[in-house]
Amino acid sequence: MINRFILNEVSYFGAGARKQLPEVLARLNLHKALVATDKGLLKVGTAKMVTDVLDEAGFAYDIYSEIKPNPTVTNVKQGVDAFKASGADCIIAIGGGSSMDTAKGIGIVVANPEFADVVSLEGCAPTKNKSVPIIALPTTAGTGAEVTINYVIIDEENQKKMVCVDPNDIPAVAIVDPELMYSLPKGLTAATGMDALTHAIEGYITKGAWVMSDMYELQAIKMIAENLPIAVEEPQNPVGREGMALAQYIAAQAFSNVGLGLVHG
């Protein structure tokens, strides 16, 4: 049996990792970004922690903040229009799964305009081109969308959830900075942490699991058990936040390659 394992080209992890952003953009020879985030993260200042780094480096960007929880086909289409209007050559995704999924949809459609209707991306769409470069900075420790090959978009016209699986959508770079997670409320910290735990358990027992994915998932389960209570009760504690940030990341690396179970459909 042949097993496939797809990862980001480059990942950075650790407190303050967002400060690597100018180096990343220069290495990839990028010149302007569309920052994909949501109004909530703009309001609480989490997105600003990233855009401040861009400002200090003199890197140009526009912001697309119309992202909603459970992003829709309309969100993606609006984002594609915003990307084209901005003259950007990359996307910086800041947020949880909704921001990441929207960014993936935008990046894939821009690179593969024959899928401009978005709905034809459902399932394993035969896209030919890699997404425009996405640099993903998660603000939750749950979905692991910064390293997965799948994303979920709501088709509002047909009232259905579209699961899209495409190796071409994986972000070029993941920057996992636990400091971006400190403002996450207790309830969301717990909920996203349980999502990460579910990913790890499902990824361990799925039929596609193998020795390499098992190493990731078992370690993720152990780290979540140790660190989620700390992150919930002491949101400013770097031990809990860093532990959860890494646990959800390695859980996603594995499940993205071996699949999940009935809990995630």
Roles of regions detected by a PLM:
Residues 19-34, 52-57, 85:
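Glycine-rich phosphate/diphosphate-binding loops that line cofactor/substrate pockets in enzymes
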Residues 33-38, 62-65, 91-94, 135, ...:
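Short glycine-rich or small-residue beta-strand-to-loop segments that form or flank ligand, phosphate
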Residues 74-176:
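Glycine/threonine-rich beta-strand-loop-alpha-helix active-site module
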Residues 1-28:
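N-terminal amphipathic/basic leader segments beginning at the initiator methionine
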